[in-house]
Swiss-Prot record:
Name the UniProt record assigns to this protein: Galanin-like peptide
Lineage: Eukaryota, Metazoa, Chordata, Craniata, Vertebrata
Organism name: Homo sapiens (Human)
Signal peptide: 1-24
Gene Ontology CC: extracellular region
Entry GO MF terms: hormone activity
Pfam families reported for this sequence: Galanin
Maturation propeptide residues: 87-116
Keyword Signal applies: yes
Subcellular location: Secreted
Length: 116
């Protein structure tokens, strides 16, 4: 009779070889993790919205969806404020310049640049 350690080692090797098969690995269910999109923004897990089976609960479902979006975005209100429209001068004017007319006075003229 063989020493008891040989059958034990063979059994252990057999079990370890079976444990490494792809069929025994847990299947990945969908895209549940965090990822980056093509622009580099961090995207969270996929949000599964409740199914609307009846039209009586339509308002409650809409409120639930709004609450979900508020929780995800961290917004205290449903629509973010719209940015104000600015012209080119206002966009590139520096705060230390003050008046927008000062911006045109600080730009060097062509003849001054050519002289130097």
């Amino acid at each position: 009779m063989a020493p008891p350690s040989v059958p034990l080692v063979l059994l252990l090797v057999l079990l370890l070889s079976l444990a490494e098969t792809p069929a025994s690995a847990p299947a990945h269910r969908g895209r549940g993790g965090w990822t980056l999109n093509s622009a580099g923004y961090l995207l969270g897990p996929v949000l599964h919205l409740p199914q609307m089976g009846d039209q009586d609960g339509k308002r409650e479902t809409a409120l639930e969806i709004l609450d979900l979006w508020k929780a995800i975005d961290g917004l205290p209100y449903s629509h973010p404020p719209q940015p104000s429209k600015r012209n080119v001068m206002e966009t590139f004017a520096k705060p230390e310049i003050g008046d927008l007319g000062m911006l045109s006075m600080k730009i060097p003229k062509e003849e001054d640049v050519l002289k130097s």
